[in-house]
Amino acid sequence: MADVSLAERLRNGSVLLLDGGMGTMLQSKGLTSSDCPEEWNVSHASVVLDIQRAYREAGSMAIITNTFGGSPFKLGKYGFGDRTEEFNAAAARIAREAAGDDGFVLGDIGPTGEILEPYGEADSETLRAGIQRQVRGLLEGGVDAFIIETIMDFEELRVAVEAISAESDLPILCSMTFSVVPDGFR
């Protein structure tokens, strides 16, 4: 772990260089479209570690865990929903090793793939409980902060922030994806 906390580093106005894409790198190492990327945290841990070490060697100051699809909802599509905590904890431990003593680990929370009521069938409480399972695994593995990536729905983002905040007081970074529509953005 770094001597200065991630929050302190950001408060001081320091630039924080993140790593690059994980999915494309895993594909270059043999991941197929039918494989679960997060399962590789257990079955191909050395491959994930090598990728993350390469990012550190290239100058990355923070490693993002291989958990973009690490919610029980996404993992369930591969038959791994019951291994949510295991896959997330393994990912955080791998990233922690790659980050070394002076790097940071960001626990990655991606979109759940669920559509919230009233437009879909998912309710906020179910979503929150699922994300909290992911968060607990990431905390067990030793993350320094969380990054919520490419969420399209403000309500899902709110639920994700609440789920993380219910389990931890670590910093939360967020990014959203917007689509251009005729009358602006969505």
Say what each PLM segment does.
Residues M1-R186:
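Domain-level signal for soluble alpha/beta catalytic cores
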